[in-house]
Amino acid sequence: EGANSNEAKGMWFGPRL
């Protein structure tokens, strides 16, 4: 995982967390 994965996950996990 890296910046690329973090940005993709941020779309779903960002607003959820």
Swiss-Prot record:
Molecular-function annotations in GO: neuropeptide hormone activity
Tissue: Expressed in abdominal perisympathetic organs and abdominal ganglia.
Domain of life from the UniProt record: Eukaryota
Subcellular location(s) per record: Secreted
Any one GO cellular component localisation term in the record: extracellular region
Keywords: Amidation, Neuropeptide, Secreted
Any single biological process term in GO: neuropeptide signaling pathway
Record-linked InterPro entries: Pyrokinin_CS
Modified residues (Leucine amide): L17
Main subcellular localisation: secreted
Task of the protein: Myoactive.
Family to which this protein belongs: Belongs to the pyrokinin family.
Name this polypeptide is given: Pyrokinin-5
Species for this entry: Archimandrita tessellata
